[in-house]
Regions:
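Hydrophobic, small-residue-rich transmembrane alpha-helices and their short perimembrane loops
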Residues: 1-91
């Protein structure tokens, strides 16, 4: 019974860490967008190239956040919930 509780706690901690990483990706994307706007203000003739590079970089970094969200959902719904049900049966 204690083992199940420890596993569920570890899943909760891991899910929290993964969600924090997704939030940090959002902060990074905002920083990149701000710097891209600054670059476009300095060099308006390069606007198309800067925007394309910014969007490509944000798409690549967003994929990490999407994968972390997928891992969190898998951990919670395929591992943690059945273990919680089992733990409640034992009580």
């Amino acid at each position: 019974m204690l083992e199940i509780a420890i596993i569920v706690a570890a899943i909760a901690i891991g899910s929290g860490i993964a969600l924090v990483s997704g939030g940090l990706v959002g902060i990074g994307e905002g920083y990149v967008a701000g710097k891209a706007v600054e670059a476009m203000a300095r060099q308006p003739e390069m606007e198309g190239s800067i925007r394309t590079t910014m969007i490509l970089g944000q798409a690549v970094s967003e994929s990490g956040a999407i994968y972390s969200l997928a891992v969190v959902l898998l951990l919670i719904f395929t591992v943690a919930l059945p273990l919680v049900d089992r733990l409640l049966e034992l009580l």
